[in-house]
Amino acid sequence: MAGAVRGLSARLREVSGLLAGRFGRPEICVHETDPVRNLVLTILSQNTTDANRDRAYGRLAKRFPTLPALAAAQASELEEAIRVGGLAKAKAKAILGALARIREERGGYSLGFLRGMPLPEAREYLTSFPGVGVKTANILLLFSFGMPAFPVDTHVLRVTKRLGLVPGTSTLAKAALSLEPHVETGDHGPLHLNLSRLGREVCRPRDPRCAECPLLTVCPEGKRRMKAHPAPVRNALPGGLRSVRLEGHATGGPGGVAARGGAQ
């Protein structure tokens, strides 16, 4: 058992290093100013794109500029304001329910008391709210309080399943709780962001770009796919450059400069 634990921790460190080599190491800003607003934003982020989440939050903030105003809103008013983000009825119910309970229990709109709680207790409190699952709670605890929580979204789940880091039957919550203790201290945020980015840009649900993946050397699923469907040779890029794919690497351009899509 101890060997398996060490193995998982070591694999996560290796994965994190490879991702940082491709994407860099994201800086994590902890937004402690208003965790309740961050909770609202995180609920809005469920099952939608970042762009639609931000549009929904912008419309919500414009129509209900303060938390008391938002808490006093009719469900239908809130649904209309956030409709662009999808699942408006469920999200409006979750937001209004959370605000009402926080106001009743704390006498105001503050979650600052979570800062002094152990991570498991803080997560248990947040997930006791209808509409708030482990992913939503972990995002809030990581980015609002700087706790070592590890959010697993659909992209992170897909990547970690293909890497064999979690069982193929894992849910978002089970994967998060399984991986979290083995992530290196200080790496919960950067690893989450880089895995999620990889899932969006490279390790897509369909037609994953395994030949371009920085994790190909440590990914059983990627190796299987590459063996079954070798990457083709490609030529004639714009500007007269050529790119040749060989064993999962892209080279091309003057002097053999690597040409990798998505590297920033």
Model-derived regions, located:
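Short, contiguous pre-domain boundary segments
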Residues: 1-3
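Catalytic cores of DNA base-excision repair glycosylases
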Residues: 5-228, 238-248
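Generic C-terminal helix-cap and adjacent flexible tail
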Residues: 221-233, 254, 262
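Intrinsic disorder/low-complexity segments
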Residues: 235-263
